Amino acid sequence: MTETFFDKPLACREIKEIPGLLEFDIPVRGDNRGWFKENFQKEKMLPIGFPERFFEEGKLQNNVSFSRQHVLRGLHAEPWDKYISVADDGKVLGAWVDLREGETFGNVYQTVIDASKGMFVPRGVANGFQVLSETVSYSYLVNDYWALDLKPKYAFVNYADPSLGITWENLAAAEVSEADKNHPLLSDVKPLKPKDL
């Protein structure tokens, strides 16, 4: 859990390093039984800055990945927007890299995410995380349906690229897929044009 976990007011912050990347504080209510949160409620999120365009195509798919400590996933930019959060008592170190064409190409942001925080990640921004807790259930709500024919639209950057300056926890102990180990360095990534997003 982060330093302030329970009873934060619902709030949204724009991340200046990466336009469109939003960080949300999510109210978590706890007692002797555990805790409860509304992970996402459209009526409350839109007025504080959640993008209305997320719902334009009427497609929503919610995914949950389960990972163990030291697992590192990323960095992937899929052809959809996503709202990510942690669905249990776990904690991750999240990292994002702007792969969109423009002056913020290559900009990086990272923060720790637990159940009291959510992130809106616009398409074209690569997303990755490393598990800091014993396990974590990582939830991501996306605005398109997964389909194999969308794979060619994915973009990737290597999590260990020193030019990114990402500070991972104990990278030598990280459990990483072969695919993620072989993603290109930022210098070899072709910036994503608006028409490709």
UniProtKB/Swiss-Prot annotation:
| Entry keyword annotation includes Isomerase | yes
- Coiled-coil portions: none
Q: Which SUPFAM superfamilies match?
A: RmlC-like cupins
Could you provide one GO biological process annotation from this protein's UniProt record?
dTDP-rhamnose biosynthetic process
Q: Give the residues annotated as active site.
A: H76, Y140
GO CC annotation: what is one?
Answer: cytosol
Q: What are the protein's GO molecular function terms?
A: dTDP-4-dehydrorhamnose 3,5-epimerase activity
Give the UniProt family note: Belongs to the dTDP-4-dehydrorhamnose 3,5-epimerase family.
Its function, per the record, reads:
Could catalyze a 3,5-epimerization.
Q: What is this protein called?
A: Protein RmlC homolog
Per the record, the gene is rfbC
